[in-house]
Amino acid sequence: MKVKILMVCLGNICRSPIAEGILKSKLNSNNFFIDSAGTGSWHDGNKPDLRSIAVSKAHHIDISNQNARQFTYEDYKNFDHIYVMDQSNKKNVLSLAKTLEDRNKVQLILDELIPNSNLEVPDPYYDEDQGFENVFQMLDKACESIVYRFLNF
């Protein structure tokens, strides 16, 4: 049975596509299913931001085939773990939770590095290219921690 992991950000074009791509590059698709979504619907069906595609490509990860979609309650049924990028994402995702089991699936992705730190991955949308590289580095470290946890426990 596959472990199903969902990455969530605001529009599903910057942070969560990068996180999805990184985690897919580190975990075997025979044992893990990884996807991403956004809390908003503005970009439904769109490809990731060109800067997200570029920074991922610079690290040998291709996210150009991803398409943005909005997080729905069905995602609670379809995923075992839901990682959000910031407190606003967390609040929006939790607003759709119906059970304690739903709520327990949700966590800030950087809590993988420093538990209960409430650290956030900043949205690089209005930033320069370096902001995307910084986000990539944060997410790469967090995904390394996720991989370690799932493969060693």
Regions found by a protein language model. Name each.
Residues H81, Q87, K91-F153:
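Phosphate-binding/catalytic loops
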Residues S16, D86-Q87:
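Helix N-cap/beta->alpha junction signal
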Residues M1-N78, Y148-L151:
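Conserved active-site segments centered on acidic
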